[in-house]
Amino acid sequence: MTFISKTQHADVVLIGGGIMSATLGAFIKQLEPTWTISLFERLDEAGLESSGPWNNAGTGHAALCELNYSPAAKDGSVDPSKALHINEQFQLSRQFWSHLVDSNVIGSPKGFINTVPHMSFVIGDDHSNFLKNRYEALKPNTLFRSMEYTEDQDQIAKWAPLIVKGRDRKQRVAATRAAEGTDVDFGALTRELTGYLQSSGAEVNYGHDVTNIHRAAGGGWDLSIKHPKSGEHGRIHAKFVFVGAGGGALHLLQASGIPESKGYGGFPVSGQFFRCTDDAITSQHSAKVYGQASVGAPPMSVPHLDTRYVDGKRSLLFGPYAGFSTNFLKTSSYLDLPLSIRPGNIIPMLAVAKDNMDLTAYLIKEVAKRHEAKVEALREYYPEAAGGNWELITAGQRVQIIKKHPQKGGVLQFGTEVIASRDGSIGALLGASPGASTAVPIMIELLQKSFPKNFKGWQSKLKDMMPGYGVKLNENPDLAAELEASTARSLQLEVANAIQG
């Protein structure tokens, strides 16, 4: 499509064609079908940046295997609260996706989600003791009842043969397994959702770059848009704007001038993965196996050996190997980081630089790591790995949040944060992990912040779409079991044995 051809006015403008914008658009179409929506994506297709299947690990993050969501306290104890919160969030995502499948809004769920057990795997006494403590903290909870624990290498070999084959039998190892884990192709899901938006009357514009945004005199927002291929420029007015442009969100949020954007900065972290598509190898592994991060490593750098399903083909992914680039998007400019510096965020950014020297040292070490050293890291999880069977691919950028802190000046925040103007006319999402897996609860939070009056009237519809909405499933075992079974049927997933019946 060439430059904006249908409208210069919209009730809602979505900036960015990733999973967040697509999810928000789907919610709005379900809740307010008469509202007009225009989506603008700078690339030629939806879901090509961080939502793309090879730009993220594709883990349906439910805290079943990610050890950084339940770290050990100084006394060795494990607090399960954050893991429970993330799992509750993922249950909402499952319910919304199930509703869309059951309503024939999107196609076969096999195109975007598949059952892949989630495992944690650790080596050595200290890590094994921690994993056992974690298991004992999580197992009594409804949402983790299916979890199994073992230190028996023969049992681990039944779950994931590659991580045991060739390993020293005297080495102490430990593993947990949750059979209900999932692998998600967020690129495919994003394209299903944007397809739904188009078929229901929304205008979806690819190859359109939103270059500026400012308040309109009569209310709402005026957006400047460029069509790079034709060189055309144009404008569109919106009553509400969502800046869901991934790493590109910070620049546009700063351009809006809203007070709520002051003091935020971004710290980009890049990553690489090894990918294997050899059927003789991929057929021997059906799990997402997460380990422990190195000292000083950011949370998104936890090593893991994953089964992936992309375009119906099974493959293996190992990594990530962290790196550093000043780009905020995989396809953007090296000037992104320096151009994001403002008088209001320079102190937080300098404070973060001073207080995170271990992270800086880790990134320098990772960038300097040679190919053979990367293969050796792979062999910690797959002892018999041959480097020639694996290709190195570059993943998407993760822009972590830098924000003001009253005592420290600034802190580096791992996670996501919804930012909305006081009048609710513009909202944005900053940050990363767990990100896409929790797109549904994140966008519900944004709807609540941006449309507080409408939100009260949406409660019944939200409950219809997601029967567990507003309920802590961990405290309602019968409803949790019912919804696990019903969403598994809708999404064609397996049900964890421990929760059946």
From Swiss-Prot:
It holds the Pfam family Mqo. One of its GO terms (biological process) is tricarboxylic acid cycle. Keywords: FAD, Flavoprotein, Oxidoreductase, Tricarboxylic acid cycle. Its cofactor is FAD. The keyword Oxidoreductase applies. Pathway: Carbohydrate metabolism; tricarboxylic acid cycle; oxaloacetate from (S)-malate (quinone route): step 1/1. It catalyses: (S)-malate + a quinone = a quinol + oxaloacetate. Its EC number is 1.1.5.4. One of its GO terms (molecular function) is L-malate dehydrogenase (quinone) activity. The keyword Oxidoreductase applies. InterPro entries: FAD/NAD-bd_sf (IPR036188), MQO (IPR006231). HAMAP family: MQO. Belongs to the MQO family. PANTHER family: L-2-HYDROXYGLUTARATE DEHYDROGENASE, MITOCHONDRIAL. This is Probable malate:quinone oxidoreductase.
